[in-house]
A protein has these predicted regions:
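Bacterial N-terminal signal peptides that target proteins for export
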Residues: 1-9
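Bacterial N-terminal signal peptides
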Residues: 9-19
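Sec/Tat signal peptide C-region and signal peptidase I cleavage site
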Residues: 20-25
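Beta-strand-enriched cores of mature, soluble protein domains
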Residues: 26-176
Length: 176
């Protein structure tokens, strides 16, 4: 039994050592950078926000999602009233967001959306103020529908504010 354990440990050490050598032999940064492909734009209308101050985790703000529209290559439709963006802010200028809502395509297909992200007010390396707002929406579409591809990809998004639209505009890209 002791011999068997020793052999397993020796084999594990050799395998780990080999993989370490392989990792160290790679060049950094990697030669390949993931590509992004535009997927859709969401124009989200919002209701009046309310906050729960001083929770054990920070300040919780809830922003109702009241509707809107979306459009991209091969998909178009409306944002369903009834979702919300749940934000949790700390005292260091960082906010975690989690928006949960549904969209409905023009051909009647409902798709669930869960969008998690970070809003941060900080400073760059030179000390200048910087604003960071990125999120990663996940889609849950009927698997056998023409929108099933939304289930099998990673997405990133960032906001765009315009004076013409009083909500938030989110531009969404698929990571190829």
């Amino acid at each position: 039994m002791k011999k068997r354990i020793f052999l397993i440990m020796l084999l594990t050490a050799l395998l780990m050592g080999g993989s370490t050598l392989t990792v160290n032999a790679q060049t950094y940064p990697p030669k390949h950078t993931p590509e992004l492909e535009f997927a859709l734009q969401l124009k989200v209308t919002l209701g009046e926000a309310f906050s729960i101050d001083n929770t054990q985790h920070g300040r919780r703000t809830v922003i109702p999602i009241t509707g809107g529209t979306f459009e991209g290559p091969g998909l178009k439709g409306t944002i369903i009233n009834g979702g919300a963006d749940y934000q949790l802010a700390n005292d260091k200028g960082r906010t975690e967001l989690e928006a949960i809502y549904c969209i409905k395509t023009d051909d009647g297909v409902y798709i669930h959306v869960r969008n998690r992200g970070i809003i941060a007010n900080g400073k760059d390396a030179s000390g200048k103020p910087k604003f960071y707002f990125k999120a990663a929406p996940q889609f849950e579409a009927p698997a056998e529908s023409k929108y099933g591809w939304l289930n099998d990809a990673l997405f990133v998004c960032e906001p765009e504010w315009t004076q013409e639209f009083k909500g938030i505009v989110l531009n969404v890209w698929r990571v190829k």
